[in-house]
Structure formats: structure tokens, C-alpha cells
Amino acid sequence: MKKQRETEQQESVIAPRVGEPVAKKQTRKKLVKRILLGVLCFLLIAGGGIGWGMWSSRYPERINMGTSCNMEDMNMSDMGSMCQAGNSGSGTPIDTLQAPQTAAHIDTFTLTAQPAHLSFGSGNASDAWTFNGTSPGPTLHVRQGDLVIVHLVNHLSFGVTIHWHGITVPNSADGVAGVTQDAVKPGQTYTYRFLAKDAGTYWYHSHQESFEQTGHGLYGMVIVDPVISTVHDDVDTALALHTWNSNPILNGAMGTVHISAQSGQWVRLRLVNTDNYPYHLTLVGTPFLVAALDGHDINGPTPLTAVPLSIDGGQRYDLRFRMPENGPVALLIAKDGDQQYAKTPAVLVGQGQYVSSALPSLNQNEFNFATYGQPRTDPITLQSHFDATYTISLGFTIGFSNGRPGPVFTLNGKSFPNSPEIVVKPGQLIRLHFENNADSGIHPMHLHGHTLTVLTKNGRALAGSPVHLDTISVRPHESYDVAFYADNPGLWMLHCHNLYHANHGMDMMIVYPNISTPYAIGNASGNFPD
């Protein structure tokens, strides 16, 4: 009986009641059919739309980034129509864009990509991908003007490369999988060769699936000492900020890094953010100077006291200070989103007891390079003649990136490989206007192979020292104007150095005309730079 009642109830959902007019019965059936048909159509359209979105967003099997257009045919105000990539058979071969023959002193290194089980301290250990068994890998210390030769040996089970972040290498040594080389396969060796032209703090990391590989340990630092130094540092230490399993680590370890220094000595801390997200930091115990940004000296830096600094993905800060008579100097850090600095210092310089009872506030005005230091004459200014100016709008949407549903980060409304391409002619002075008008996060935009001169922040000219960067961080509702000389022919990436954003579309190319490459990005080649 119970089963019979259930059956009757189910039938009553679509069956007419006894005595109901025939017309009403037919109308009811039609209505049910229409509803079912509508639901079916909706599911087919939605499913088809999702399927089309996933399919159409996938990278082609092969994307060649070579260029084959003539500058005379290009409209310099329109990025989208300037030049078509995809010709690998004509033009200057990218492999010929190498460091010149030189009698300079040679520094030779071997970096072996290999797996390792690493201890990060405080009972934390994990499998990692490393250079020479450590993460960060060895710090490469060279002198300005030296010829640097690095042999990459791959003992991992997948392809890797090395990109020299911030160093103006020739294009063949840029280390971008699918653009300047194929990823180095397991068991293979590849050699990079470049001149260390500019003194400063730089770093290196894999640019094959860089979001995954850099995050899992394939990175290290490069220090280029100047031929003639204008200042003397008694203590000089490089420090790599990174995150492992959501825990901040410094030079591959949790806890406090201890650095020896005596009263009256000058100390330089070279801070490198190898992570995707910002770190907030400050020094307590003595006033400090911001001596350099992205490896380039600040003119006339002035003392700061416990001022917060924000260092975004890929950026570098050189901090200098003189050790006080009494007590240590502490570097405090906070991850983005933290309400205060960690009570345990990240770095402790000198002897004595550190007291954390009065942590400086994260809410006070943070360091602003646009007003820091002393003005001086610079080769590039707002009054310079610019051969071309381009606006790059940084955005965000929900959609598909290479077949994956989720966030998509865009440049002028498009994501890689459909993002706009800028073609520049050797000798031109190029102006870029970056704007972040959406709440799409912080975008540290990194240009390979060139140095950016910052002209304006939010429409206002810089009032302090000239600022030269390779990674310009654009926060929500900020804008910057920057400029660079097109003096390094090749095919160069411009991308967000939050590598998650780059991995989800925030990449574009700045290329010179008539450059050919035998390499390609995509499934057929196995090259995926981000």
C-alpha cells in the first residue's frame, strides 16, 4: 500500500486530477514539456559555453614568438595591430644575440637542478627542488664588468631554465622557455654567458613553469660588486624572502637569522622578495638608509626611523645602517594581511638582548620612493622626447586560462597568449603608462632585458632621487609612467611577478622587429614559461 501511495503521489506531479477538463490536461502536459525542454536547453547552452570557454582558452600546440614585420608598416599608437608573432624562419636568429667576445675576467659557476629533502627549522621539513642541493641556491658573487659563465645541469625529472632577474643579459641568455631556449631536459646541460654590466643586487630563478618551480625552491641570488664603490660596508649580507607551506622563511629557514657586527660598523642588508606576495618590513634599533632599489643606487638617501617598507614579488631593497653603541638592530617582517609585525625578529644584527615590547605600527605612512632622496640630472625625464607611448591597463576577470576555470589576469582586457604585443625599434625611447583601475590585487610588473626609469606616480612627477627599476609594483587604483631605451634587441617578456598572476594570463611581449626564434611555447614543445 505504501509503495502504491508513493507511486500515485509521483504520478500526481504530472498527471491531471480526476474530473479535470481535457483542455486543462493538455495545457498542463505542454507546460511540463516546455519546462523540461527549457531546463535541457539551459544545461546544453551552459555546458556548451563552459566547454567552449575551456577549449578556446587553451594554448595552441605551438606558439612561436618571432617577429617578421617592418617598422615602416606599423601604427605606433595601436598595440594590437603593430606586428604579428609567429614567424621563426626569417630575421636575426635569437641564438646569435650573445655577449660579445671580451678579455674580461671570467667567473664560472655550475648550478645543478636536483631534488633534496630540506629542513626549514622548527621541525619543518619537506621535499624541494634545488640548485646544488640548497634553496636558495648558491649566491653568485661577481664583479662589475666580469664575463659570467653558468653551466646548468638538470638532475630533475622535468625541464628547467635559469632567468637572470634584473640583469641586462643578451637575449639568448634570458632563460625563458619557449622564447629564448627550450627547457633543459632531464640529464641535459645548458650554458649561459653574459657580462655583469651593472653593479647591484639581483637574483635568478627557473622560467619554465616558473610559478611552480620558483615556489618549490629553484631560485638564488646574484651580487655584482661595483668596480669603484662610493661607500664602504663592513658587513654585507644577502637575504631571500620566501614562503614555504604558508610560513615565511629567510634564506631557506624559519626563525631568526643572526648576523655578527660590531659597534660603529656599516651594515648592508640586501633583501630579495622571491615570493609572489608582498612582505612588509622595517628596521628597529637604529636609523637606516634605503641605499638601492632593484640594484640601482638612490641619490642622497636620508635616514629613516622604523618606517614600514613594502617589498613586492621580484623586488630588491638594499638597506644600510651604522651599528649603534648598544644593543642589536632587528629586521621585523609581516606577511601581507598581517595586522602587526612578528614579535620574533627575522634578522638580528649585533650582540645584546632584543626587546619586543614596543613594536612599531604597520599603519604609519610607508616608504615612498617617489619623494625619497635628492634630485639629480638623469638621462630620461618627463621632458624627454618619447618615440612611442603605450597604456597598459591591468585587470582581472573570472573565466578560463589555458583550459582552467578560475581567475584570469589581463593586460588591456586580454590574457596571454592573446595579450597585446609591443614592437620597438632599436634606439627608440619608449614610455609606458601602467594603470590598475580594478581591485585585482598588486601587480609587480617585471620587464626582461631593460631598466625602467620611473617618471610619475599617480600623475605626479618624482620629487626625490631618480628611480630605476626592473620591477614596478602597481597597487589597486595606482598608476605609473615609466620609460626605457630600446637598446637590447630580442624578444622580451613583460609580466606580473606575482607568478600566480602570470600563470593565469598576465604576460605580454615587448619585441624588436625581424627577430626569429626556433623555439616555441605550448604542448608540442613542452615549454611553458610561467
Locate each region found by the language model.
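Histidine- and aromatic-enriched segments that form or immediately flank copper-ligand environments
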Residues: K30-K33, I50, F109-S229, P278-L309, ...
